[in-house]
């Protein structure tokens, strides 16, 4: 199925690209999320009329993500406390939601879906490097210091 992308989609393309995707991916994800429209003659003409508006919106989103990444770089580290045993292992774990809440409390609004924990939830005390994926082109890193209560 041919679609026109209205937003940058990872591993697929950027604003305005006409791409061929599987029908289910288009019908169940791209079109309902507002990331694409079917590539009909009417939609192509409508898109060309709105191209500048959509590109400006994409540039604005990129600038906002870069500003948030700069704020995260200023913070550099956040501290999260949890109950732990004598050997440093936590009773439970620190999830992406806990890290997002700590970053939001530090002054940068971050959603839990933007926090990337490469090896799953944090289960030990100490410092851990965590990546924050703010935009397809913007990533930031923050150090999470897990402290025992």
Swiss-Prot record:
GO biological process, one term: translation
GO molecular function terms attached to this record: rRNA binding; structural constituent of ribosome
InterPro entries: Ribosomal_bL9, Ribosomal_bL9/RNase_H1_N, Ribosomal_bL9_bac/chp, Ribosomal_bL9_C, Ribosomal_bL9_C_sf, Ribosomal_bL9_N, Ribosomal_bL9_N_sf
Keyword Protein transport found: no
Record-linked Pfam families: Ribosomal_L9_C (PF03948), Ribosomal_L9_N (PF01281)
Any one GO CC term of the record: ribonucleoprotein complex
Keyword entries, A-Z: Ribonucleoprotein, Ribosomal protein, RNA-binding, rRNA-binding
Top-level lineage group: Bacteria
Job of this protein: Binds to the 23S rRNA.
Family: Belongs to the bacterial ribosomal protein bL9 family.
PANTHER family, sorted: 50S RIBOSOMAL PROTEIN L9 (PTHR21368)
Protein name: Large ribosomal subunit protein bL9
Organism this protein belongs to: Actinobacillus pleuropneumoniae serotype 3 (strain JL03)
Organism taxonomic ancestry: Bacteria, Pseudomonadati, Pseudomonadota, Gammaproteobacteria, Pasteurellales
Name of the gene this protein is made from: rplI
């Amino acid at each position: 199925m041919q679609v026109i992308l209205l937003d940058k989609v990872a591993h697929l393309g950027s604003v305005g690209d006409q791409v061929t995707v599987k029908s289910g991916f288009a019908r169940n994800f791209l079109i309902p999320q507002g990331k694409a429209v079917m590539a009909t003659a009417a939609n192509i003409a409508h898109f060309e009329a709105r191209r500048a508006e959509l590109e400006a919106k994409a540039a604005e989103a990129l600038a906002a993500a870069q500003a948030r990444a700069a704020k995260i770089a200023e913070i550099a580290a956040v501290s999260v406390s949890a109950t732990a045993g004598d050997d440093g292992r936590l009773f439970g774990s620190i999830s992406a939601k806990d890290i997002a809440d700590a970053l939001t409390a530090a002054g940068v609004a971050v959603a839990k879906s933007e926090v990337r924990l490469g090896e799953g939830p944090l289960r030990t005390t100490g410092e851990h490097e965590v990546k924050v994926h703010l935009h397809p082109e913007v990533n930031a890193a923050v150090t999470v210091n897990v402290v025992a209560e």
